[in-house]
A protein has these predicted regions:
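Membrane-interfacial amphipathic/re-entrant helices at transmembrane-helix boundaries
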Residues: 1-39, 68, 79-82, 108-113, ...
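Helix-loop-helix "hairpin" substructures at the membrane interface of multi-pass membrane proteins
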Residues: 33, 154-232, 256-262
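Transmembrane helix-bundle core of multi-pass membrane transporters
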Residues: 104-180, 204-207, 272, 277, ...
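Alpha-helical transmembrane segments within multi-pass membrane transporters and channels
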Residues: 77-121, 127, 261-266, 296-297
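Short, non-helical or kinked segments that cap or interrupt transmembrane helices
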Residues: 35, 44-66, 107-112, 183-186, ...
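Membrane-embedded helix boundary and interhelical linker motif in transport proteins
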Residues: 28, 50-96, 100, 272
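Inter-helical junctions in multi-pass inner-membrane proteins, predominant
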Residues: 18-36, 156, 177-182, 208-248, ...
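Cytosolic-side transmembrane-helix boundaries in multi-pass membrane proteins
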Residues: 2-14, 22, 100, 131, ...
Length: 308
């Protein structure tokens, strides 16, 4: 009880010393962090929603995206070129992984692809360590995106605003693709009932291939965007993977809309907790997940019994 009282007094003291502007800036920082979570989680949800594959290698694709960007820049490329090249290259790698490793495991239950991608993630991380070393590298923010901009409540890093904007563009493009194209219609129908899609004469294996490629491409893009914020290290994918699984569980397994809402919510919760109680920042993610699962076990937009 005494410790709880001391903790409450410390928290009250911190809150008393905070201005509205500082809280608002921290909220924007949470949105920028949440944007990275969103990009990572929508790829994870897209793959699970269509393929029913829990891709434990998703964090490794995220990490590869950061390293590919770093390598391209070392060859004389620039960040703007990387924004296009990285998702393309990582997506092509994802296509190869699906075609060669994952496709033979379809129809064998959820466990086999899970174990395979779990092992694949370790292989990918070790390959990066052998190729680039165990230590990390800084990733310079593009010169045009350095500095801060006045957003009314204070100055906010321009690059973080760019991350929020880039995420919004990707979400819009993905929505247009899924809602306004015939292939997007097939993907949405296949996520609900693959058998119906097969009856219509659609090559489901080709659809799964493209979906896996898109999901991994988005993960690589997220890794590239995160690189200037946190640097590039082989373990960066494992860190976000645990947090992103919380996002997908809270949002609902396989739900892209849920991943967007939950990603932003988790980012804001982590950011605000870091302001008021820094030692509880990481714990707050799992506390949020526990609360959501108690109230709604399938998450915000998940379907009951999806994992059965």
């Amino acid at each position: 009880m005494a410790r709880a009282a001391v903790g409450a007094r410390k928290l009250g003291g911190r809150m008393a010393g905070l201005s509205f502007d500082l809280i608002a800036l921290q909220l924007f920082a949470g949105l920028a962090l949440g944007a990275i979570y969103v990009l990572f989680a929508i790829g994870l949800s897209l793959i699970f929603g269509m393929l029913t594959v829990v891709n434990f290698a998703h964090g490794a694709f995220y990490m590869v995206g950061a390293y590919v960007g770093l390598y391209l820049i070392s060859l004389g490329g620039n960040f703007w070129l990387c924004l296009v090249a990285v998702p393309l290259l990582v997506g092509l790698f994802g296509l190869a992984v699906e075609r060669v490793l994952i496709r033979p495991l379809y129809g064998r239950g959820i466990d086999y692809p899970l174990l395979l991608t779990f092992g694949l993630s370790y292989v990918m991380v070790e390959c990066v360590r052998i190729s680039f070393g165990k230590t990390g590298y800084p990733f310079d923010t593009p010169e045009v995106l350095q500095g801060a901009v006045d957003i009314g409540v204070g100055y906010f890093p321009l690059y973080r605003l760019f991350v929020i904007g880039a995420t919004a563009v990707v979400l819009l493009a993905l929505w247009l693709f899924l809602e306004k194209t015939s292939f997007g219609l097939i993907i949405r129908a296949g996520a609900r009932d693959p058998q119906i899609v097969r009856v219509l004469g659609v090559d489901v294996s080709r659809v799964w291939l493209i979906v896996f490629g898109i999901g991994t491409a988005i993960a690589g893009f997220a890794g590239l965007l995160a690189a200037p914020l946190q640097g590039v290290i082989p373990e960066m994918g494992g860190t976000i993977l645990a947090e992103a699984f919380v996002v997908t569980v809270v949002g609902g397994m396989g739900s892209i809309g849920g991943a967007v809402l939950a990603g932003l919510l988790v980012g804001v919760v982590v950011s605000m907790t870091s302001l008021f109680a820094p030692e509880m920042a990481k714990v707050s993610i799992f506390a949020l997940m526990a609360i959501v699962l108690i109230i709604r076990p399938q998450g915000f937009f998940g379907r009951a019994g999806l994992m059965s």
